[in-house]
C-alpha cells in the first residue's frame, strides 16, 4: 500500500522540506490519473533537462564575458563546454526555448526534439533521456504547466538557506557534490538553482518510490538505510562499487560523506551495474545532475549473466540486492562461488559471494538482505554462512526496524564484511564480530512506514566505530570512544561463540535482553497496589458493560 502522499522526511529543516514539498505538491497535482511509475519519467526528465540547461547557460555567460582563463573563448564552440565537463545544449533544446513554448499544443514534440538533440551532441547521454512527451496520452496543457512549475526552482533558489550539517555530525541530507575526478561544472560560481535541482531530483525519487509502493523498491533504497551503510564503512578513498545500483543512491551518499569529512573527491571512483534499462537511465541522470562521473558499463545487464566489471577489485562495495530472488541465472561452476554453490531458489548468497569476489585485499562491503539470510539452513545456505564466518569475513551484523522500505514489509538486516580485520589502522578484530539490534530505533512517519532518525544513525554508527577503534571518525586530536557491550543493543562475540549458536548471525541471539530500570518499590508494597488498581479496572469494566447493555435494550436489542 502506498504511503500518504504528503508524508515528509524527518530531521530536515522545515524551510528545505517546505520548498521541496511545495514543488512536489504542484507537480503531483498535475499528474491527474497518470500512473506514478509513468509520471516519474515525465517529471525527472524535465528536471534533468533544466539542470543541464542552467549549467550550460552559466558557463556560457563566463565564456561571453571572456575574463581570465576565458579570454578569447568562443561561446558557440561545444569543445569549450566539454573541456569543463559541461553538457553542450543546442539552442532549440535550452530551457528558455522550452518555457517560451510551454503553452503551444506541440510542446510534447518540442521537448522530445530537445532530448534527441542533447543525446546527439553528448554521447555520454545516448539512450538515457526520456523521449515520449509527444504521446497522445500525455496532456499537453498539463505538460506546459509542469514546465512552469519546474521553472520556479530558479526563482526560489535565492530564498533557500544553505544546507546545514545533520545532527549526527556525519554530513548533510542535502549536500551538493563535486565529481569524483574533482571536476565540476561551474565550480564555486555555480548558481543556487542548479544546486537545488540535485536536491529536488533526490526528493522526487523518494516521493515516487512511496507512490509506487512495492515497485518503488526496484529503483530506490530508503535514505536512512543508505546513510547507515555509507557512514559505517566511511568510503574516503578508493573504488566504490554497487552491482545492483538502482537509481544510484549509494553513490550520491558516498560523495556526500567524502565532502562532509573534508576528503579528496579526486580519490574516489565509482562503478555500477543495473539490470533494468529504465532504472539505469534514472541512475545516469541522478549522478549527472550532481556532476558525479561513474562507470556504469556500456549498457544495462544482469550481474549474474554478464558481469560488466569482471576485473574490478573494489575498496568498498555498497548494495541493496533484490530480497530472496528466486528467478536468477546460476552457473554451477562460476568462479564467484568460493564458499559454496548458492541454491537456485534464492540468490541471497549468490549476491554475497559476488560482493566478496569483487573486494580488494583490504576491501569492505556493506549490504542489505532479508533477515532469513542470518539463520536459514535451507539448500546449503547455512553451510555458506558457516564458511563465511570461519573465513573471518563477518565484521558486523545489524538487525533493522521493520517498515523501512516502500517495497516490502520483510524485516531486513545489514551485513558488513571485511577481508582484513587487522589492517594496522584500527584495533585487531580477528575472530570477533559485532552484533547490533536496532529494531527499536525508529520513528513512524506514516501509518505504514518508519525511518531511522539522525540520533538513531549516530547510535548505530558510533557503536561500530568505537568497536573498531576507528581514530579517523573520532578526529586526529580526539581519543576514540571506548566500546562496551550494552544489554539488548550490542555485543562483541567471538567466532567460537557464534559456532556455539550454530553459526546463526541474528543479533538477538547475542545481545540479550535490555536491562529494565527498577523503580525501587519493594515487592511487598508494589503487589497490593497493582492488585487494587486491577480490581478497580474490573469494576469500571463491569459498570461500562452494564451501561452498554442498557443502551442496547433501549434500542430494542438484547432482550
Q: Which sequence ranges carry the predicted segments?
A:
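Extended hydrophobic-aromatic, low-complexity segments
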Residues: 326-330, 366-367, 376-379, 397-398, ...
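Conserved Class I SAM-dependent methyltransferase catalytic core
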Residues: 29, 38-51, 229, 280, ...
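Non-catalytic, mostly N-terminal accessory regions of nucleic-acid modification and defense proteins
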Residues: 1-161, 173-174, 189-233, 295-308, ...
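Feature representing long, continuous alpha-helical segments
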Residues: 252, 281, 319, 349-353, ...
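Active-site lining segments that contact anionic ligands and/or coordinate catalytic metals
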Residues: 313-314, 336, 346-348, 362-364, ...
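Conserved S-adenosyl-L-methionine
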Residues: 215-319, 324-328, 333-336, 345, ...
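Short, contiguous acidic/charged loop-to-helix segments that flank catalytic cores in large enzymes
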Residues: 33, 328-346, 371-381, 401-407, ...
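Glycine-biased, low-complexity coil/linker segments
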Residues: 169-171, 183-184
Amino acid at each position: 500500500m502506498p504511503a500518504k502522499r504528503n508524508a515528509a522526511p524527518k530531521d530536515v529543516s522545515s524551510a528545505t522540506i517546505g520548498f521541496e514539498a511545495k514543488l512536489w505538491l504542484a507537480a503531483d497535482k498535475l499528474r491527474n490519473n497518470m500512473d506514478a511509475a509513468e509520471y516519474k519519467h515525465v517529471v525527472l526528465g524535465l528536471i534533468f533537462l533544466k539542470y543541464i540547461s542552467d549549467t550550460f547557460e552559466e558557463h556560457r555567460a563566463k565564456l561571453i564575458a571572456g575574463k581570465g582563463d576565458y579570454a578569447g573563448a568562443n561561446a558557440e564552440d561545444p569543445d569549450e563546454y566539454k573541456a569543463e565537463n559541461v553538457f553542450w545544449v543546442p539552442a532549440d533544446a535550452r530551457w528558455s526555448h522550452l518555457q517560451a513554448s510551454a503553452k503551444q499544443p506541440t510542446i510534447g514534440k518540442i521537448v522530445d526534439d530537445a532530448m534527441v538533440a542533447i543525446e546527439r551532441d553528448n554521447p555520454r547521454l545516448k539512450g538515457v533521456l526520456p523521449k515520449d512527451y509527444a504521446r497522445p496520452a500525455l496532456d499537453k496543457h498539463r505538460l506546459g504547466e509542469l514546465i512552469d512549475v519546474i521553472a520556479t526552482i530558479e526563482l526560489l533558489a535565492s530564498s533557500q538557506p544553505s544546507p546545514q550539517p545533520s545532527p549526527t555530525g556525519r554530513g548533510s541530507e542535502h549536500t551538493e557534490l563535486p565529481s569524483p575526478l574533482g571536476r565540476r561544472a561551474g565550480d564555486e560560481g555555480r548558481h543556487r538553482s542548479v544546486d537545488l535541482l540535485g536536491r529536488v531530483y533526490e526528493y522526487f525519487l523518494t516521493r515516487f518510490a512511496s507512490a509506487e509502493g512495492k515497485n518503488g523498491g526496484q529503483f530506490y533504497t530508503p535514505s536512512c538505510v543508505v546513510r547507515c551503510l555509507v557512514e559505517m564503512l566511511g568510503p574516503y578513498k578508493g573504488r566504490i562499487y554497487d552491482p545492483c545500483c538502482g537509481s544510484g543512491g549509494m553513490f550520491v551518499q558516498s560523495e556526500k560523506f567524502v565532502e562532509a569529512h573534508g576528503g579528496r573527491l579526486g580519490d574516489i571512483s565509482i562503478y555500477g551495474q543495473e539490470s533494468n534499462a529504465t532504472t539505469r537511465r534514472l541512475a545516469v541522470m541522478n549522478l549527472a545532475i550532481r556532476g558525479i562521473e561513474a562507470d556504469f558499463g556500456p549498457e544495462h545487464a544482469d550481474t549474474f549473466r554478464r558481469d560488466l566489471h569482471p576485473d574490478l577489485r573494489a575498496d568498498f562495495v555498497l548494495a541493496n540486492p533484490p530480497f530472496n530472488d528466486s528467478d536468477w541465472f546460476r552457473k554451477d561452476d562460476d568462479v564467484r562461488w568460493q564458499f559454496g554453490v548458492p541454491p537456485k531458489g534464492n540468490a541471497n548468497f549468490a549476491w554475497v559471494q559476488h560482493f566478496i569476489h569483487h573486494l580488494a585485499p583490504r576491501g569492505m562491503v556493506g549490504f542489505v538482505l532479508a533477515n532469513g539470510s542470518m539463520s536459514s539452513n535451507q539448500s546449503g545456505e547455512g553451510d555458506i554462512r558457516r564458511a563465511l564466518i570461519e573465513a573471518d569475513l563477518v565484521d558486523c551484523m545489524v538487525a533493522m526496524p521493520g517498515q523501512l522500505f516502500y517495497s516490502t514489509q520483510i524485516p531486513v538486516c545489514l551485513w558488513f564484511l571485511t577481508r582484513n580485520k587487522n589492517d594496522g589502522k584500527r584495533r585487531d578484530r580477528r575472530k570477533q564480530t559485532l552484533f547490533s539490534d536496532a529494531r527499536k530505533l525508529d520513528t513512524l512517519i506514516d501509518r505504514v512506514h518508519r525511518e531511522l532518525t539522525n540520533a538513531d544513525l549516530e547510535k548505530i554508527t558510533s557503536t561500530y566505530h568505537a568497536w573498531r577503534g576507528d581514530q579517523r571518525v573520532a578526529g586526529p586530536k580526539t581519543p576514540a570512544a571506548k566500546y562496551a557491550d550494552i544489554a539488548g543493543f550490542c555485543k562483541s562475540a567471538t567466532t567460537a561463540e557464534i559456532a556455539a549458536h550454530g553459526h546463526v548471525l541474528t543479533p538477538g541471539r547475542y545481545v540479550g535482553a535490555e536491562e529494565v530500570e527498577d523503580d525501587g518499590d519493594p515487592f511487598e508494597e508494589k503487589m497490593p497496589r497493582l492488585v487494587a488498581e486491577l480490581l478497580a479496572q474490573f469494576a469500571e469494566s463491569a459498570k461500562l458493560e452494564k451501561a452498554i447493555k442498557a443502551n442496547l435494550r433501549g434500542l430494542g436489542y438484547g432482550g
